[in-house]
């Protein structure tokens, strides 16, 4: 069986343009009855790169994040929370500019009409200063939270310049997961892929295999991540990994070109490849429905 699933395959499964992913095993009838009213959905945005300037790549670089915020606010039903999976800002060596960009980003996303907005860093936010500026604006680099029966784990695989989670954080993860049942629903939020998608393109986590080995001990695990600026779906054993699009620029499919490079802006198809997603957590059926939304006038 293939580990990778393309968009056409997913649409065949979903039928109506909403991809449905089964995560782990179904819950018991008693557990279903207990939680049947607790299904919910949230929004994932990623790789907003506030501060990027490149008219050949995105002539609307000052507008796409604002368009994404407006699109989320215009959804028929507001999500219970929004999560940004890293690269909130464009990297810079200037300490002041770095903080200015983070402040501007924070001001823009404060316009989201949701109760809770959660953040995590990307390498553009945290690798140059090991997350010092990021923590001033957004808090912890890694943490957990629980929502309606699902345990969310936010992992930092970017503040270490070697693209590692690190021994200390791995021990923290192992201790955290020991405190919950093996059949608990777990969603891991991270920036880089935990598996070796394309290591020569920096699409991997150096010690990701150790993280996956830890997660494999639990039956219901799903990973949502960013970094690769495109929708991508992969399985490691029973663990599903789903990458999100960027709101700033698209990147080519892994291995499709000799060298990774930003896809130039096409005036005939503005905003193509840019977007965000809704994730509906269906607790009773142990599934996640992922629906992709465009930014701007995407084709």
Language-model features: where?
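Short active-site segment of divalent metal-dependent hydrolases/proteases
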Residues: 50, 90, 125, 194, ...
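C-terminal/domain-terminus segments
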Residues: 290-299
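Active-site glycine-centered loops adjacent to acidic/histidine catalytic or metal-binding residues
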Residues: 47, 86-87, 122-123, 191, ...
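Extended active-site neighborhood of metal-dependent phosphoesterases/phosphodiesterases
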Residues: 34, 93-185, 203-222, 228, ...
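N-terminal secretory signal peptides and thylakoid transit peptides that target proteins
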Residues: 1-21
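Short acidic, glycine-rich surface-loop motifs adjacent to enzyme active sites
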Residues: 181-197
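N-terminal active-site segment of His-dependent metallophosphoesterases
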Residues: 13-14, 29-99, 175, 182, ...
